[in-house]
């Protein structure tokens, strides 16, 4: 077996055999297949696709590249959630402690920023002292004592995916549906969770730009999970506009704490509660009330204990960028569009994301929104504030935001897109 023949098969729109898939995943994990060769194969997969048999085998090979975890020793059922990635998508941060407060155990293995979307681990690492890297023993201890853990997948869990995930981010192959589905589900199945809720984003700020592609991805992942014995359900949610009022690491942590304190933007609260209800139902927990757990402080208590158990200080001041630039409304009227993709790229260019997989991120960088679609604005009022430690980045970020919003005359009717577009089980 050689990698060139595998690349040629997919380049020429052929079906990869089980033997080819098993070999290339194993060889890439061991370093026999180089990054540039796997990049070529990933691009061929993006351009020519994979059928269900290939995707299932690719996922199984990724799982087989490492260990599998087991949570049978826990006294409560496990529930996990995964988002396909969006702009301002900080939902995992309030969601994990909220679901834990309602009686489930939440082993949330999360990732770094990918493309223009933020990464949960990058956000949490803006909290002084917080650790993303835990041993399996540490992870089980945090989960057992606080009910929730958010951490990086260990090197032993789907190591093939860890390498490929970073490679896709810097080779223009993030959007390949077979690679998205297998990446997510290999980690989640290997992780050993009993139930899984998928938040499949749709719109300009998502990797799935239209509802048809999002449904294909959701059905593929639900099928992979169900066939592996994991109770899996997917919500398709809107990502044409950023979630909440912030995009950036420390900015989003601050907003998440507001939600846990019983406040926060309405769209973030709505989606957090909806996903919590799905997770609790999938885990078989009846009569829990996520809204009550937000209101009575129990979700906040679980957050504080979870952060502290991973070395973080929940009371510490979060990093603030050294420089700010305010973008003002050019006219008065109704803000009818605010493009999530432009905001995501803008935040990324300010330093909230990476250009290369080894790049650091700026904890305080990002974009703070002062208006959302449907709001009335006045000429000259702040629309958004850009944050960065590197002022020369402002021009680059502003270019991404150009043409990314519309202001219609005052009195123009506005109909908001629902946050939840579909449910697939």
Where do the model's predicted regions map?
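Acidic, glycine/proline-rich low-complexity segments that act as flexible tails and inter-domain linkers
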Residues: 1-88, 305-309, 420, 424-425
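Well-ordered secondary-structure scaffolds
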Residues: 5, 10, 15-18, 28, ...
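Alpha-helix C-terminal capping segments
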Residues: 47-48, 94-107, 187-192, 227-228, ...
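Glycine/serine-rich anion-binding loops at beta->alpha junctions
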Residues: 77-100, 104-117
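Short acidic, glycine/serine/threonine-rich loops at helix termini
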Residues: 92, 110, 117-122, 153-154, ...
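Short beta-strand segments
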Residues: 109, 143, 151-153, 199-203, ...
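A glycine-rich helix N-cap at a beta->alpha junction
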Residues: 123-149, 219-225, 229
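Phosphate/diphosphate-binding glycine-rich loops and adjacent basic-rich segments that engage nucleotide
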Residues: 144-193
């Amino acid at each position: 077996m050689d990698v060139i023949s595998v690349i040629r098969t997919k380049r020429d729109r052929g079906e990869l055999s089980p033997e080819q898939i098993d070999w290339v995943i194993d060889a890439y994990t061991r370093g026999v297949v180089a990054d540039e060769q796997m990049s070529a194969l990933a691009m061929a997969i993006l351009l020519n696709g994979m059928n269900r048999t290939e995707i299932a085998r690719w996922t199984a090979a990724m799982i087989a590249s490492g260990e599998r975890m087991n949570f049978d020793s826990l006294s409560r059922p496990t529930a996990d959630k995964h988002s396909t990635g969006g702009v301002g998508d900080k939902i995992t941060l309030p969601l994990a402690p909220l679901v834990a407060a309602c009686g489930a155990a939440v082993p949330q293995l999360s990732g770094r920023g990918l493309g223009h979307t933020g990464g949960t681990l990058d956000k949490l690492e803006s909290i002084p002292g917080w650790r993303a890297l835990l041993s399996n023993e540490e992870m089980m201890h945090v989960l057992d004592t606080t009910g929730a853990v958010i951490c990086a997948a260990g090197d032993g869990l789907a190591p093939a995916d860890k390498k490929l995930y970073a490679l896709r981010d810097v080779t223009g192959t993030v959007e390949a549906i077979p690679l998205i589905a297998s990446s997510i589900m290999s980690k989640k199945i290997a992780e050993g969770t009993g139930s899984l809720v998928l938040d499949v984003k749709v719109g300009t700020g998502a990797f799935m730009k239209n509802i048809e592609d999002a449904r294909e991805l959701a059905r593929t992942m639900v099928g992979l999970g169900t066939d592996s014995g994991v109770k899996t359900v997917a919500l398709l949610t809107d990502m044409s506009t950023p979630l909440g009022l912030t995009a950036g690491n420390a900015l989003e942590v601050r907003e998440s704490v507001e939600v846990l304190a019983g406040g926060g933007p309405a769209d973030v609260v709505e989606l957090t509660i909806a996903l919590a209800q799905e997770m609790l139902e999938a885990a078989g927990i009846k009569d829990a009330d996520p809204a009550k757990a937000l209101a009575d402080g129990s979700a906040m208590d679980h957050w504080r204990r979870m952060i502290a158990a991973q070395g973080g200080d929940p009371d510490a001041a979060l990093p603030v960028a050294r420089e700010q630039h305010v973008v003002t409304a050019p006219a008065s009227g109704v803000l009818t569009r605010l493009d999530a993709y432009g905001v995501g790229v803008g935040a990324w260019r300010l330093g909230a994301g990476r250009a290369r997989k080894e790049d650091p991120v700026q904890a305080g960088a990002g974009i703070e929104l002062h208006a959302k679609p449907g709001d009335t604005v006045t000429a000259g009022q702040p629309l958004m504030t850009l944050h960065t430690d590197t002022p020369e980045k402002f021009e680059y970020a502003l270019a991404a935001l150009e043409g990314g919003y519309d202001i219609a005359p005052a009195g123009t009717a506005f109909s908001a897109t629902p946050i939840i577009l579909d449910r697939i089980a």
